[in-house]
Amino acid sequence: MIDTPCPAFGRRFVVEASNSDPATGHGHERDNQADCEIHATRTATNQRARFFLRRGHWVEVYDDDTKELLAGPFDPDQAAPAYIV
């Protein structure tokens, strides 16, 4: 398999992992956010989102510039989606 990064043409993605459902408003409270990473490729973004889901975290993906929610929130108790970003 050839692993070629998928360029996002200058777009950066923020992967946020939290310990509770961010849709309830609790995901952004202190100590509920497990991690936050910024990636420049869709490939890296997808890999890290799946990494956090496998570890039981809720996951959301945002556009770093516009702060627009692009994907999620994904429930770690559900099957991972086939497409994230």
Question: Model-derived features: where do they sit?
Answer:
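Charged, amphipathic alpha-helical segments
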Residues: M1-D3, H39-R48
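Non-catalytic signal-transmission and effector/linker regions of two-component phosphorelay proteins
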Residues: M1-R12
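Surface-exposed coil/turn segments at beta-strand junctions on protein surfaces, enriched
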Residues: A8, R42, F52-R54
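A short beta-strand micro-motif
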Residues: R11-D21
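Hydrophobic beta-strand residues in large extracellular and virion-surface proteins
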Residues: F13-V15, A49, V59-V61
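Short, mixed-charge low-complexity intrinsically disordered segments
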Residues: L53-V85
